[in-house]
Amino acid sequence: MSFELRVKKNTPLTGETDSKLVAETFLKLIGYLSSGEKVNSIPFRLFACFLFHPQKEWMVDELTIELKTTKATVYRHLNKIKALDILEEGKIDEGKKAKKTYKIRYGNLKKAWNFVEANVELAMNNYGETVNHLQKLVEAK
């Protein structure tokens, strides 16, 4: 799965005290939520499951029940969160076979965000190498 994040110039939301409003705005800034989605949307509520219950290991079946939606919808939005690289996968034995679980890395969004920053740094370094290579190609003509 490829890492994906929208990077946009912004002002830190440190003056806001409503955690849901901060989360909603933040998720729109990074491209997880579209501009029209609100806190009652499935994508926001899915992210909120992880954010507000960081130690809980969620199975897809549990998320389906919690969000009152289909597995396909849960997986569609779960894959967007996984693309940010902030979730860790686990397994839980349930009957005959183990089922995957998901939770915020280290049970802490701030710590999980270090993975995002590392991926951004790597991507920017790779962009820089490509720009340098392109400039050399242009100058060689």
Give the label of every model feature segment.
Residues K68-A83:
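Short amphipathic alpha-helical interaction segments
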Residues L109-K141:
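Amphipathic alpha-helical dimerization/coiled-coil segments
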Residues M1-E37:
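N-terminal leader segment of winged-helix/HTH proteins
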Residues K82-D93:
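A short, conserved structural fragment
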Residues V22, I42-L46:
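Residue-level detector of well-ordered alpha-helical segments, enriched
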Residues Q55-E66:
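Short acidic, hydrophobic short linear motifs in intrinsically disordered regions
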Residues S35-P43, M59, I92-V116:
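Short, cationic-aromatic polyanion-contact patches
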Residues F47-Q55:
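Short, locally clustered residues in the helix-turn-helix/winged-helix DNA-binding domain
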